[in-house]
Amino acid sequence: MRICITSSGPNLDSLVDPRFGRCVYFIFVDEENKRKINVVQNDAVNAIRGAGIRAAQTVIDQKAEVVITGNIGPNPFDALRSSGIKIFQAPPGIKVKDALSDFKENKLTEITSLFRGRGFGRGRGFGRGFGRGFGRGRKSF
């Protein structure tokens, strides 16, 4: 099994990066080949847009079967799931080696769906600035 873990550093003692699309490194661990480790720098870390999709494509190209990360957006989530890759959430502040150990012991939660609420994070003003401002931001004539 090939496992991908988002990481803030290039080794197993680094912390799991909570951001999938903007993580600094992907650490791939191949359990079948005596824990062979491959570290790949995330090219999408400084992308203006589309970082999540580009990161997902990197993981797919590396033939990962499982991803362990902190948080993941809807676009990379859909891309990974449609490729048959399972996604697990690591708790904040955990080291890569500990997340890997927790995965093997079935202590991590699989992310099977994302909550996509109304407005997709834009709030009540739907991105136009007409939120809970009691009329502020909108001219009244």
Predicted segment positions?
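Mid-chain, well-packed structural core segment of small domains
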Residues: V59-G93
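Extreme N-terminal starter segment of soluble prokaryotic enzymes
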Residues: M1-I3
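Conserved mixed alpha/beta catalytic, RNA-binding, or beta-rich assembly cores of soluble enzyme
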Residues: I5-Y25, Q41-N46, I53, S140-F141
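Compact, glycine-rich, soluble single-domain proteins
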Residues: N38-D61, E65
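Cofactor-binding loop segments of dinucleotide-utilizing enzymes, especially the Rossmann-like FAD-
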Residues: S8, E31, G70
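Short beta-strand scaffold segments in enzyme catalytic cores
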Residues: F26-D30
